[in-house]
Regions:
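Contiguous, non-catalytic segments that form substrate-binding/exosite surfaces or channel walls
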Residues: 1-136
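Short, glycine/acidic-rich hinge or "gate" loops at secondary-structure transitions
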Residues: 4-7, 50-65, 101-107, 167-174, ...
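C-terminal, non-catalytic "cap/extension" segments appended to globular domains
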Residues: 4-6, 12-17, 22-27, 55, ...
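Active-site recognition of the HExxH zinc-binding catalytic motif
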Residues: 9, 142-165, 180-188, 228, ...
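Glycine- and acidic
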Residues: 19-33, 66-77, 132-145, 161-174, ...
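Inter-helical turn/loop segments and adjacent helix faces that build the functional surface
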Residues: 26-30, 52-53, 95-98, 162-170, ...
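Generic structural signal for well-ordered, non-transmembrane alpha-helical segments
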Residues: 33-47, 86, 181-184, 248-252, ...
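Post-HExxH zinc-binding segment in Zn-dependent metallohydrolases
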Residues: 174-203, 210-213, 217, 291
Length: 373
């Protein structure tokens, strides 16, 4: 019903149904096309983020219900929130020495909710309150590696918001795609830090496992959602779409992205993902792909110019409500995101990280085999 209403409005306005999504994200269709073309060309490589984890568990493909499972290592871990926050603050110093005390302020002010409570759902959500110049993190922290990386994403959002405090409200409307850049870049910094300073092979492998989960969730799975939603809109133009047809569209999109890396599909994906039913956002899926691939691309730039990157990155975030995404990248990073080079650099960084996981997983498995076996 919502899609039919939207399509009728687009018909009257004589516009493509993707146009509002581009406007909301302040990004050009050419940039999104360049991103998606690069990602589609690398789907075979990206599937290794799923297959490599499946092989480590002794299977050739991943069961759908295991896509978000933690690393199957012998030790059980619970990371206290205080420890997780210390790691996140330490990572933040790479960008700004003020980040640790700023994040402490967020906690002291009661702006961060992480408790486990009866009936409280898992997950995390960020909201900036413009009228108060205050960030809010609403979440349930579970003590897992995945939960810690989720907190890093939330603190990345909060830092982005904090950098813009004091600017006029009309200059603080952050495009969704750039919100995801800020959050996902912070998660990447956390992955890098833990892998570099891991006290054991298990800890390093856990961080790599979570990073591959991060890649498959935010690139492959979001690719499924993007293609499915576009296909659904095209079908809805013709009339009412049956449940069977919707399920078939999802299966086709799943197969196109996951290929043979999973055993079956998630049949309820189109039902249980609230992003398909949001009335204020159009196509809230490709911004995650944008944010993730972009974060890896920016990480490559950071390693090439570590001395000047923090200042440039801060100015990039501060100005994210003042100009288009395309213009931001041109001004601060001298990058044309309508061309494939930047996106391909991010995807190559993902490929290298998958290779590192495969190497570490092989070494760990060899050590775990008894000598007399």
């Amino acid at each position: 019903m919502l899609t039919g209403f939207r399509l009728k409005g687009f018909e009257f306005a004589e516009m493509d149904f993707m146009a509002p999504a581009y406007w909301q994200n302040a990004v050009s269709s050419e940039a999104v096309d360049a991103l998606m073309t690069a990602v589609r060309a690398n789907r075979h490589m990206l599937r290794k983020s799923v297959i490599s984890r499946a092989l480590f568990t002794g299977k050739s493909v991943m069961e759908v219900w295991d896509l978000n499972a933690p690393a199957p290592l012998r030790r059980e871990i619970h990371i206290p929130y205080e420890e997780a926050l210390e790691k996140i603050k330490e990572v933040g110093k790479v960008l700004d020495e003020c980040i640790p005390e700023t994040f402490d302020l967020f906690v002291e002010k009661g702006w961060v909710e992480v408790r486990q409570l009866p009936g409280k759902q898992n997950g995390a959500f960020f909201q900036g309150i413009l009228s108060l110049n205050e960030p809010r993190i609403f979440s349930t922290y579970l003590g897992s590696f995945a939960s810690m990386s989720q907190q890093a994403i939330m603190y990345g959002h909060a830092w982005h918001f904090w950098l813009q405090r004091g600017l006029p409200a009309q200059e603080r409307k952050i495009p969704r795609a750039l919100m995801e850049v800020a959050g996902h870049f912070f998660a990447l910094l956390l992955f890098e830090e833990i892998q570099a300073k891991a006290a054991s092979a298990e800890e390093k492998l856990e961080a790599l496992w979570q990073e591959l989960t991060f890649i498959s969730n935010y690139v492959i799975n979001m690719g499924v959602r993007f293609d499915f939603e576009r296909s659904f809109f095209e079908e809805r133009k013709k009339g009412v779409v049956s449940v069977t047809k919707i399920s078939n569209l999802l299966s086709e999109a799943w197969q196109a992205w996951y290929g043979e890396s999973t055993a079956g599909v998630d049949p309820y994906l189109w039902i249980n993902r609230g992003q398909f039913y949001k009335i204020d956002d159009y196509f809230y899926n490709y911004p995650y792909i944008f944010g993730t691939v972009c974060a890896y691309g920016l990480s490559e730039i950071r390693h090439r110019m570590p001395e000047v990157f923090p200042k440039i990155y801060s100015e990039f975030l501060q100005n994210s409500g003042r100009m288009s995404v395309d213009d931001l990248f041109k001004k601060f990073f001298k990058v044309d995101i309508t061309q494939p080079e930047f996106w391909e650099s991010g995807l190559k960084a993902m490929e290298r990280k998958i290779a590192v996981f495969e190497t570490e997983a092989r070494k760990y498995s060899e050590k775990s085999v008894p000598e007399n076996s």
